[in-house]
Amino acid sequence: DGTLIDTVSGKTFPEGVWDMELKMEVFAQLKKLHPQAVLIVSNQGGIELGHVHPAMFQPKFIYVIACLQSYIGLNTLVAGQFCPYNDKKHPKRKPNPGMLEDMLAEFTHNTGITIAKEDCLMIGDASGLEGQFSDSDLKTAENFGCDYLDVTEFTNMELPEPLFKVIRLSDGEVVKDKDDNPLQNLTESEATDKVVFLMEANPEPQEQFTYVPMLWEVPHEPEQAPQPKEKIIHMNPKKQ
């Protein structure tokens, strides 16, 4: 609340799960960054106090995650956790960094990509500024060990045009041109033109190309769960 969504009522805290609208200006800024991951953390102590039922809040939370994932694209992982507890000592209640630490570790486990805490940026609306209800987001960033921006400052920033690289879908390797120069640090329009040229020059279905953000890395193959052995089932009809 206040960072990715706002209340329609204009109140600091929503009157119900229906009292929300997406902050598309924040969505747009996040998309320009092309981050490897967007990890959403939210204190929801109202659940423990009985103000909102978890069965009502969870679909709202999932909806916001799904909206951002759909908008920002599949090259960025969007995930989230919320803390329903009010105990200030609970490791997952902001300003404690437990939720961020859990999700960053899970991201590394699932993708094989390691992101250092100092390379992360936290964006929030509880920055301790005049008129704000708290500084819990700012303190969370400090406790986690990453940089911080208030959401208003973030949306007002002039961000540079994102850059891309062209890769082979078969192995994720960056494609090189005829002069052996890697096709990277391209604008989106330049990358699109390069992909179109490569697809026309290589019509074979096994040669497919696309462009991805410069920060994109090839994720590792997910661990294969053990498969049960096939069993032959003999159906013995019951004798009459």
Regions found by a protein language model. Name each.
Residues 48-71, 93-106:
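Short, electropositive alpha-helical surface patch
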Residues 121-160:
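Acidic, Mg2+-coordinating phosphoryl-transfer loop and its flanking beta/alpha structural elements
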Residues 16-22, 52-60, 94-95, 132-136:
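Alpha-helix N-cap and loop-to-helix initiation/capping positions
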Residues 192-239:
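Short, mixed-charge low-complexity intrinsically disordered segments
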Residues 1-39:
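Active-site neighborhood of HAD-like aspartate-dependent phosphohydrolases
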Residues 92-135:
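Conserved Lys-Pro-Asp/Glu-containing loop-to-beta segment of HAD-superfamily phosphomonoesterases
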Residues 160-180, 211:
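Short aromatic-glycine-(Arg/Gly/Cys) micro-motifs in beta-strand/loop hairpins
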Residues 26-61, 76-89, 123-126:
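Substrate-recognition element of Asp-dependent hydrolases with the DxDx(T/V) motif
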